Regions:
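Conserved N-terminal alpha-helix of the aminotransferase class I/II PLP-enzyme fold
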Residues: 70-103
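A glycine-/small-polar-enriched, mobile loop at the entrance of the PLP active site in fold-type I
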Residues: 43-46, 61-80
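PLP-dependent class I/II
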Residues: 3-10, 14, 18-20, 25-28, ...
């Protein structure tokens, strides 16, 4: 009996989706670790803390109180109200509950907005380095991602002049994160004002401000383009609880923006997932309204780790690395080590090659900057114990010393 197997004809749109390199490297490092190898995983993009106890207790109480049914697509009134209050009191932003939609993580919020706003052929400006999923999201909607380059010498920030030079009649959106994943750079008030002065001259450009790392900011006050009244009605803030509250597994994100965009996102989300988890939503209310001491503690620990890890990497020759003002990543430039040869005779032509070498020989998992739009860098997370970070720095230094010209 001969059975003929025929491949399923998958849709063309899948070609626009590139596998997340952060998830791929994390998976590879876990597989290696499962074989007994002592791998230090610095590729993962989540806090190494557990969710604060009061938030977990609130979830248990929510279940006891009957919050186990379908919630409204845009989110429970309790949470939308808590988010609006947070934005008003902490950020000075005049968003009401009707301006907010709660989604299954900030990634979901981003994709909702991009699908709601982008038509085929629209250009979306994304300052590089950028989060790995931005280009795929844009292409999935039929848009064209336009990367704006930066450098370690500029602290990985794009000037207002450079931003203006990339705007064309096809530009529909500006999408950026601050604090930035992967560089950790934070746009300050002066820099954002300069961007604002450019953007007011182009009223057809919508702005998506990804502020998921807001709570992990070592530079002082968090600043947002949404603070400028001149941009009102054409900007949306994307945020969530994953990073600042160590709630990555709860999948809680939100968009705050113009009501018509919220209504559009509600339609899209209603088609895909309906409302986000009701128990997690009630736990998130407690996160916003409860004590914030654990949030501050986590930020302080991250800052201490940043300082120690940056100092250790700075001892490695020819490895420029900015001192980030936010998030929990270092983004060193590895240009000097590209083109060198491993002891086994393999030439490391790209940052991808170098990351595989670090994992296989140094047993340190990092993510290539190629995925973030910066091919000469690698991303190293310091969401790990300080002892592990020091050990990782030693392994990286040794791996680099073993390379030959």
């Amino acid at each position: 009996l001969v059975v003929l197997l025929r491949m399923i004809a998958l849709s063309d749109r899948l070609s626009e989706i590139v596998e997340s390199q952060t998830l791929a490297m994390t998976k590879r490092s876990r597989e290696l670790k499962a074989t007994g190898v002592d791998v230090i995983n610095l590729s993962i993009g989540e806090p190494d803390f557990d969710t604060p106890e009061n938030i977990c207790n609130a979830a248990t109480q929510a279940m006891a109180n009957g919050y186990t049914h379908y919630p409204p697509v845009s989110g429970l009134p309790e949470l939308r109200g808590a988010i609006a209050k947070k934005l008003q009191q902490e950020n000075g932003l005049d968003f009401q509950a009707e301006n907010i939609i709660v989604s299954n993580g900030a990634k979901h919020s981003l994709l909702n907005a991009i699908l709601a706003l982008i038509n085929p052929g629209d250009e979306v400006l994304i300052p590089a380095p950028f989060w790995v999923s931005y280009p795929s999201m844009i292409r999935y909607a039929g848009g064209i991602p336009v990367s704006i380059p930066s450098s370690v010498e500029d602290d990985f920030k794009v000037s207002a002049e450079k931003l203006a030079s990339y705007i064309t009649p096809k530009t529909k959106m500006l999408l950026f994160s601050s604090p930035c994943n992967p560089s950790g750079s934070v746009m300050n008030e002066t820099e954002l004002k300069a961007w604002k002065d450019v953007l007011v001259k182009h009223p057809n450009i919508f702005i998506l401000s990804d502020e998921i790392y807001e709570k992990i900011n070592y530079a002082g006050k968090h600043c947002s383009l949404a603070e400028y009244p001149e941009l009102s009605g054409r900007i949306a803030v994307i945020n969530g609880l994953s990073k600042g509250y160590a709630m990555t597994g709860w999948r809680m994100g939100y968009l705050a923006g113009p009501k018509e965009l919220v209504v559009a996102c509600d339609k899209i989300q209603g088609l895909m997932t309906s409302g986000a988890n009701s128990v997690a939503q009630m736990a998130s209310v407690t996160a916003f309204e409860g004590p914030q001491d654990t949030v501050l503690h986590m930020k302080n620990v991250f800052e201490k780790r940043r300082n120690a890890f940056h100092a250790a990497l700075s001892l490695i020759p020819n490895l420029p690395c900015n001192l980030p003002d936010g998030a929990f990543y270092l983004f060193p430039d590895v240009s000097h080590y590209l083109g060198k040869t491993t002891p086994e005779g393999i030439v490391l032509n790209t940052a991808d090659d170098l990351c595989l070498y670090l994992l296989d020989k140094g047993h340190v998992s990092a993510v290539s900057g190629e995925a973030f739009g910066h091919a000469s860098c690698i991303r190293l997370s310091y969401a790990a114990a300080e002892e592990q970070l020091m050990k990782a720095a030693e392994r990286i230094a040794e791996a680099f010393r073993n390379l030959k010209d």
